[in-house]
């Protein structure tokens, strides 16, 4: 996580909250003590670490539940994601299932910095290469 990453996300999202953009003001915040990454940037960056880009059984993401930003991520920190299947439910009449994934974003020290459930819609059957 670089300062340039944080500033690029601010420019893209329009979120210029002082804790992301103003070092002096961010140091005054007792929760951060300096500039930090946007929580929503962490979620987006984490998706890039676990989402398979090729066509496959996952049809769509449809939500996030129980999102908590537990610990700030600062410029220079590194993140990784731990994800595991938490719950599966079949919607047979619809031809798909719903999968709830337990996700944790973890920093270079092994501390959880964010936790949440990712909700996905997954095909019940393999989808043919050619759809008529």
Where are these regions (language model features)?
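Hydrophobic beta-strand-centered segment that forms part of the acyl-chain substrate-binding groove
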Residues: 28-37, 41-87
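Hydrophobic transmembrane alpha-helix bundles
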Residues: 1, 57-66, 70, 94-107
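Catalytic strand-loop segment that frames the active site of acyl-thioester-processing enzymes
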Residues: 1-37, 122-124
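HotDog/MaoC-like acyl-thioester-processing domains
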Residues: 73-78, 82-132
